[in-house]
Amino acid sequence: LKEIDLKNFDLIIEPSAGNGGFSDFLYSFNMVALDIEPEKDYIIKQDWFTFDTSNHYRKVLVIGNPPFGLRNILSKRFIEHALKIENINTIAFVLPDVFNKHTNQKIFPKEWKLKQVIKLPRDSFTLDGEEYHVPCSFYIWTKDEVEKDLRFNPDEFITQDFEYIL
């Protein structure tokens, strides 16, 4: 979490808090943790897809490890809902490494910049009490100005150096 200056946000939301993987570390900030099946008392039983922030928050961070679902359908829905809420300006999610691909990054409109990608170590997850490997990274997307947008740009790899003859 040192990659994000948490003091810059009026509100921090963990939309799929589960057992508090992120929110346990964010408790000293103005934070809301949500889950449809909360595992801790401070986590609000709330469906992320029906949640909206108050308009009196200027800068909102959404952070967490959303469920991925088959072909990342659920993680994309979590992103899409965050993008609909106007005062959310940073989304920091653990996502499968397929989000390194341009086709998956296109979910973010042009005004969103990929600020940072932090590769998670092997066996960062547990399943039934056992370490479990899922190739994932922590992606930080923002509407703020960034030094360099790390979004994959396929145009950078187009060349005019070859002529194709069919």
Segments from the language model and where they lie:
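Class I S-adenosyl-L-methionine-dependent methyltransferase catalytic core
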Residues: 1-166
